[in-house]
């Protein structure tokens, strides 16, 4: 290892005592990956909530993202590619964010004391973001792996079958709150950090943040209920396997 690299590793500065730019670059990458994931979360919620319109609407949305505009029957592998990309971004964002986590009990106690003494709203929001981010890394990874390996199962019958019969309802209720809280807090903190809305006060941004949280959680719960209802209907209609659920979705396809 070069002497300059050793100095930079210990002190965060180059040989000439110039502040290393690596930390700023890592911070930018963390912000960029977080923004991509937050925007994906917003788009994803609107897409899956299409089941609130109708089963056919949800099926058409699923097929659209399989490239049905260009391929007559759609290609589920396209969804797998997107899922793989999101997994990579999620992992990168998680590792970048870990730099700022308390790494031992002593650091955690320092943070807890600081949080208690400051009684600052944004410090509390960071703590919520850290907890939800930790949970989301594991919960979202399971969901994304299913999307990666079983993209053909996405549809009103297939997705609701996974909800009820495969018992994914338990994972999804925790994932819903983790994603919506983490994402809205993240966008709020990014807006302050990078000065995106300089004409809006911090109080105004907080109101927008809480409005986003409430809106997407309510939308998510309504969507969650719709998939549960559809999953129970699947059972009543005698759909016993995922393959049968996929075949039921196929009836929406128009030649």
UniProtKB/Swiss-Prot annotation:
Subcellular localization(s) per the UniProt record: Cell inner membrane
GO CC annotation terms, alphabetical: plasma membrane
Molecular functions (GO terms): metal ion binding
Cofactor note text: Binds 2 heme b molecules per subunit, called the proximal (bP) and distal (bD) hemes.
Stored InterPro entries: Fum_red_B_TM (IPR004224), SQR/QFR_C/D (IPR034804), SuccDH_FuR_B_TM-su (IPR000701)
Membrane-spanning segments: 33-53, 78-98, 126-146, 168-188, 208-228
Record flagged with keyword Chloroplast: no
Topology term for the membrane: Multi-pass membrane protein
Pfam families: Sdh_cyt
UniProt entry keywords in alphabetical sequence: Cell inner membrane, Cell membrane, Electron transport, Heme, Iron, Membrane, Metal-binding, Transmembrane, Transmembrane helix, Transport, Tricarboxylic acid cycle
Binding residues for heme b bP: 93, 182
An individual GO BP term: tricarboxylic acid cycle
Reported cofactor(s): heme b
Residues that hold heme b bD according to the record: 44, 143
Similarity section: Belongs to the diheme cytochrome b FrdC family.
Task performed by this protein: The fumarate reductase enzyme complex is required for fumarate respiration. This subunit anchors the complex in the membrane and binds a diheme cytochrome b.
Subunit structure: Part of an enzyme complex containing three subunits: a flavoprotein (frdA), an iron-sulfur protein (frdB), and diheme cytochrome b (frdC).
Protein name: Fumarate reductase cytochrome b subunit
Gene that produces this protein: frdC
């Amino acid at each position: 290892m070069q002497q300059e690299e050793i100095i930079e590793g210990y002190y965060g500065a180059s040989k000439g005592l110039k502040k290393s730019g690596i930390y700023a670059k890592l911070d930018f990458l963390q912000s960029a990956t977080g923004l991509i994931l937050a925007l994906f979360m917003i788009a994803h919620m609107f897409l899956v909530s299409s089941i609130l319109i109708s089963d056919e609407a949800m099926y058409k949305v699923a097929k659209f993202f399989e490239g049905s505009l260009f391929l007559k029957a759609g290609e589920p592998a396209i969804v797998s590619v997107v899922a793989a990309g999101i997994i990579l971004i999620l992992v990168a964002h998680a590792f970048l964010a870990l730099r700022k986590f308390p790494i031992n009990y002593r650091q955690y106690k320092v943070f807890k004391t600081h949080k208690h003494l400051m009684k600052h709203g944004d410090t509390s929001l960071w703590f919520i973001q850290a907890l939800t981010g930790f949970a989301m890394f594991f919960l979202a990874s399971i969901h994304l792996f299913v999307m990666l390996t079983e993209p053909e199962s996405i549809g009103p019958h297939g997705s609701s079958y996974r909800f009820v019969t495969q018992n994914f309802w338990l994972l999804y209720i925790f994932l819903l709150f983790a994603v919506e809280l983490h994402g809205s807090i993240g966008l709020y903190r990014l807006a302050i950090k990078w000065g995106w809305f300089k004409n809006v006060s911090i109080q105004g941004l907080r109101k927008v943040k809480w409005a986003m949280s409430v809106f997407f959680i309510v939308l998510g719960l309504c969507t969650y209920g719709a998939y549960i209802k559809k999953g129970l209907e699947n059972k009543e209609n005698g759909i016993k396997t995922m393959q049968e659920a996929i075949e039921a979705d196929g009836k929406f396809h128009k030649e």
